[in-house]
């Protein structure tokens, strides 16, 4: 049947013209969503957000309705329960709805002449023999007969006699011991099955009936089913197949005898599960550590049976600054602030002005700088209606109206509105000039003065006029030059109403009014 199914699938694939083209993105996103592991994320929040993103990429809730999403989920589950070869064949055609899936499978069944609800004989046989509580053996599991591993004088004995031990419970070697053990282990210690039985069990009447039954003959003749521990050669007789299958039949009988005992113990343990654990967070931490050993290495001498006590999330106290700069030791309350501060040490200036090419450490600095190009002055004085590009400039200006001068020089008694102005003034008393030019050795009391001076050595002129292309070393020079193009004359004489572009021109003009008075 497997050969016929494979040939039919290959023939259908060769007739690919009857199917429409499909989009593979949906299948890719579905596989990413289903195969995502917790250890791929840095924490629970990132893992949940990643799953949410993958699920939205797969189901596309903004484009699909609720009914379409439900149909997509049911379609996925339906394909999962199909046989492997049929599931692969259907997925390759990527049907767009459930009607297409059903029609594809019906066409394949009609081509193979298979009944709609065909049940494999070996599955039906296991369901009849295995009572409630016994382990279900997957049909694709490889059974290796222990008779092939017996060494010594007992090799010449029949297969069934050589396999059954003289004392102690028999060990089932299915080739997948870990899977069977995980299936039987519910998390609590289960009693060992007393599967010791004698050779007289072979004379049970149901065994004889099973050997002579039509279903057993079909199972032995079929190439689909269990892979017995010996190779099925073409010239192997039915009698040899029966001898090989016989230990498996006896094993089923032993499991059937122990089924009620296993079920009784399971019910007793199930009653103990009604009380939930006291600390669910501890159990969750255990589960995460067991499933994700790569997240944290456990010391070799540690006791794994000791309960884990995860540290609770520690709240930040007001004023706490846990993020410290390794270069200068300065601390910050947020990691983003530390990242911006570290750019000072590295010299990185990622934010570039598209107008003049000047670079800045922070985006806020770039935003304030761009106001110079746009002429935006969002801060307005309520007294004189003068506007400023920065709020700090507005606050300093408002002190001139209130005559508030909080910063006073102790040397000469002069007061200032800004602390920075007082600091610059104090340098006139001390004669301090900490900023020195490395080219000519000249010193300056202010850093801005040194910056302007250094442009004389480099001939840098960063301030360019957009009208005529002329460049200037200082921004005030550019502002005065722009008044030539705009015709602006902000300085007005109070005597004759004449206006001037520069304050120096107004002062020289006012001298003409006072000459007659002198």
From Swiss-Prot:
Region of interest (Disordered), residue spans: 292-325
Q: Name one GO biological process term.
A: spermatogonial cell division
Which residues belong to zinc fingers classed as C2H2-type?
323-345, 351-373, 379-401, 407-429, 435-457, 463-485, 491-513
In what ranges is there compositional bias, type Polar residues? 292-304
The cross-references to InterPro entries, in alphabetical order and at most eight, read: SCAN_dom, SCAN_sf, Znf_C2H2_sf, Znf_C2H2_type
Compartment annotation: Nucleus
Name the GO cellular-component terms: nucleus
- UniProt cross-references to Pfam families, sorted A to Z: SCAN, zf-C2H2
User: Which GO terms of the molecular function aspect are on file?
Assistant: DNA-binding transcription factor activity, RNA polymerase II-specific; RNA polymerase II cis-regulatory region sequence-specific DNA binding; sequence-specific double-stranded DNA binding; zinc ion binding
Assigned keywords, A-Z? DNA-binding, Metal-binding, Nucleus, Repeat, Transcription, Transcription regulation, Zinc, Zinc-finger
The segment(s) forming the SCAN box domain are 30-112
Belongs to which family? Belongs to the krueppel C2H2-type zinc-finger protein family.
Q: What does this protein do, in the record's words?
A: May be involved in transcriptional regulation.
Report what the protein is called.
Zinc finger protein 449
């Amino acid at each position: 049947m497997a050969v016929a199914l494979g040939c039919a699938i290959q023939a259908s694939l060769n007739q690919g013209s009857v199917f429409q083209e499909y989009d593979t993105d949906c299948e890719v996103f579905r596989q990413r969503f289903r195969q995502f592991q917790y250890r791929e994320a840095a924490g629970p929040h990132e893992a949940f957000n990643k799953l949410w993103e993958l699920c939205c990429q797969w189901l596309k809730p903004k484009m699909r309705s609720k009914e379409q999403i439900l149909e997509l989920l049911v379609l996925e589950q339906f394909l999962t329960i199909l046989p492997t070869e049929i599931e692969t064949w259907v997925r390759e055609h990527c049907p767009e709805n459930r009607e297409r899936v059903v029609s594809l499978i019906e066409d394949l069944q009609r081509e193979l002449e298979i009944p709609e609800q065909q049940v494999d004989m070996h599955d039906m046989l296991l369901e009849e023999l295995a009572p409630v509580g016994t382990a279900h053996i997957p049909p694709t599991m490889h059974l290796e007969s222990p008779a092939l591993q017996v060494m010594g004088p007992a090799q010449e004995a029949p297969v069934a006699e050589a396999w059954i031990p003289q004392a102690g419970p028999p060990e089932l070697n299915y080739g997948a011991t870990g899977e069977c053990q995980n299936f039987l282990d519910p998390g609590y210690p289960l009693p060992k099955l007393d599967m010791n039985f004698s050779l007289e069990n072979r004379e049970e009447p149901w065994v004889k009936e099973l050997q002579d039954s039509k279903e057993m003959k079909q199972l032995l003749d079929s190439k689909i089913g269990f892979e017995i521990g010996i190779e099925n050669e073409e010239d192997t007789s039915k009698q040899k197949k029966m001898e090989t299958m016989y230990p498996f039949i006896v094993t089923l009988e032993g499991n059937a005898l122990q089924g009620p005992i296993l079920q009784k113990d399971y019910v007793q343990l199930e009653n103990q599960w009604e009380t939930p654990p006291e600390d669910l967070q501890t159990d969750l931490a255990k589960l995460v550590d067991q499933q994700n050993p790569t997240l944290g290495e456990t010391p070799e001498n540690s006791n794994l049976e000791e309960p884990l006590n995860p540290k609770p999330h520690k709240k930040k106290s007001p004023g706490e600054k846990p993020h410290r700069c390794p270069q200068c030791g300065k601390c910050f309350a947020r990691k983003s602030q530390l990242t911006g501060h570290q750019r000072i040490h590295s010299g990185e200036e990622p934010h570039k002005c598209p107008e003049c090419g000047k670079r800045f450490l922070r985006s806020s600095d770039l935003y304030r700088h761009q106001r110079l190009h746009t002429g935006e002055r969002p801060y307005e004085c309520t007294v004189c209606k003068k506007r400023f590009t920065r709020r700090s400039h507005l606050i300093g200006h408002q002190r001139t109206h209130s005559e508030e001068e909080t910063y006073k020089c102790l040397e000469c008694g002069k007061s200032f509105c800004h602390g920075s102005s007082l600091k610059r003034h104090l340098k006139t008393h001390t004669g301090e000039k900490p900023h020195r030019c490395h080219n000519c050795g000249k010193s300056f009391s202010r850093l801005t003065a040194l910056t302007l001076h250094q442009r004389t050595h480099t001939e840098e002129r960063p301030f360019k006029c957009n009208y005529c292309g002329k460049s200037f070393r200082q921004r005030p020079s550019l502002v005065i030059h722009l008044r030539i193009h705009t015709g602006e004359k902000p300085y007005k004489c109070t005597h004759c109403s004449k206006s001037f572009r520069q304050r120096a021109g107004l002062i020289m003009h006012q001298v003409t009014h006072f000459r007659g008075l002198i």
